[in-house]
Amino acid sequence: MRLVQLSRHSIAFPSPEGALREPNGLLALGGDLSPARLLMAYQRGIFPWFSPGDPILWWSPDPRAVLWPESLHISRSMKRFHKRSPYRVTMNYAFGQVIEGCASDREEGTWITRGVVEAYHRLHELGHAHSIEVWREDELVGGMYGVAQGTLFCGESMFSRMENASKTALLVFCEEFIRHGGKLIDCQILNDHTASLGACEIPRRDYLNYLNQMRLGRLPNNFWVPRCLFSPQE
């Protein structure tokens, strides 16, 4: 197994099965963040993740962290909070603000560079990347974004500026996703936060099998239309 240098003249990727074991899942470097290359990557179970100043690095870890939306773990305290939630939740109202929020709300630094922001904004304009926004009155207080692959959603990042804001985004999205035929959320790499919400690890080969099936599925044509998903009770 060796790290592959991508060409700027081809959007082809090597097989994810050739990814390194250490660091886990590192597959290739280089290329660019063009919409065509990003979409090719997601279709093959690959995603970009790199630090500012480094070359673009492409990953496909084994195992893969996923969340079955019906298995989302909501604590009793969160259920109580949500019943009296002060938040309004929307979809695709403010993609730019959400990705900027994810980029700026990381005290330890972020991989979401200006180039990444611009790349995913282009994907959003093309109808492939989507955001969930959480509002307290007219203030954006949390949200999440990711890339759609049929009935599978590749979650990229989330942020929270007020209590339970990002959890609210995920909860409301999961409910809506399930209701309209969504099957699986890709969480990429398991961490304590996603594990606490019900994410689990599965072998990469299983994830790739799910991806190949689900990316051919379809949600309703109007699913990603900008709209309000949840409003606080009066």
From Swiss-Prot:
UniProt KW keywords: Acyltransferase, Cytoplasm, Transferase
Q: What is its main location?
A: cytoplasm
Q: What is its EC number?
A: 2.3.2.6
Q: Highest taxon of the source? A: Bacteria
Pfam family membership, one = Leu_Phe_trans
Q: Which InterPro entries match?
A: Acyl_CoA_acyltransferase, Leu/Phe-tRNA_Trfase, Leu/Phe-tRNA_Trfase_C, Leu/Phe-tRNA_Trfase_N
Q: Which GO terms describe its biological process?
A: protein catabolic process
* Gene Ontology CC: cytoplasm
Q: Report whether Transferase shows up as a keyword of the record.
A: yes
Gene3D superfamilies xref list: Leucyl/phenylalanyl-tRNA-protein transferase, C-terminal domain, Leucyl/phenylalanyl-tRNA-protein transferase, N-terminal domain
Recorded GO terms, molecular function? leucyl-tRNA--protein transferase activity
What is the catalytic activity of this protein? N-terminal L-lysyl-[protein] + L-leucyl-tRNA(Leu) = N-terminal L-leucyl-L-lysyl-[protein] + tRNA(Leu) + H(+); N-terminal L-arginyl-[protein] + L-leucyl-tRNA(Leu) = N-terminal L-leucyl-L-arginyl-[protein] + tRNA(Leu) + H(+); L-phenylalanyl-tRNA(Phe) + an N-terminal L-alpha-aminoacyl-[protein] = an N-terminal L-phenylalanyl-L-alpha-aminoacyl-[protein] + tRNA(Phe)
According to its UniProt record, where is this protein located?
Answer: Cytoplasm
Q: Which family does it belong to?
A: Belongs to the L/F-transferase family.
HAMAP family from the UniProt entry: Leu_Phe_trans (MF_00688)
Q: What does this protein do?
A: Functions in the N-end rule pathway of protein degradation where it conjugates Leu, Phe and, less efficiently, Met from aminoacyl-tRNAs to the N-termini of proteins containing an N-terminal arginine or lysine.
Query: What name goes with this protein?
Result: Leucyl/phenylalanyl-tRNA--protein transferase
Q: Which organism is it from?
A: Escherichia coli O127:H6 (strain E2348/69 / EPEC)
